[in-house]
Amino acid sequence: MFSHNLYKYIFAYSYKGTKPANMPRPSRKRGKQVKKRGISNEQVCVATALDRQRNLIIELLCTGRMTSDELKKLYNNRIGEDSILCTDSHKSYMQFAEDMELEHKRIKRGKHKEDIYHIQHINSLHSSLKRWMNRFNGVATKYLGNYMKWFKWIDTFSAEKESIQIKSFMLHSHIPYSYTKIKEFKNRMPIFV
């Protein structure tokens, strides 16, 4: 049996670097918050999953509130059938676990632990993600997926020795190759799962 912590992290939708003529809404001045209360389409949901071996899944999921269908699309064939899901009390996780026929341990609101099941590891991951993202003073949402991959790479190789990290960096930086024009890159939309 494997235990997986599933959780979401919310970022404000950012058009940083977009010219005023191309903006779909007026810009937020001096870092003001999202205007709508609660989770809205002005926010981006990043889904995260972490198991006991520190295997990490971190991807842009959707704008606004996540659904069980989006979770199925993301985690299909990535989580084993005999896994136990440890999540918060969001309804999408309950429906997802039921649809995928997985054992589900729900941690109640205001709690972090129930018996031997907890969400401390994923909470720790989110605090380090938040610290890491704060260094950049805001990231355009269209590039957020790239930053999540970068964070995953750093998290995956942080425990290795420096010489192994350098070899891994060289290997991973030269494997993927894609041909993209600058014009296409500037005007692209965020890539959700």
Predicted regions and their residues:
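Residue-level recognition of single "structural anchor" positions
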Residues: 1-193
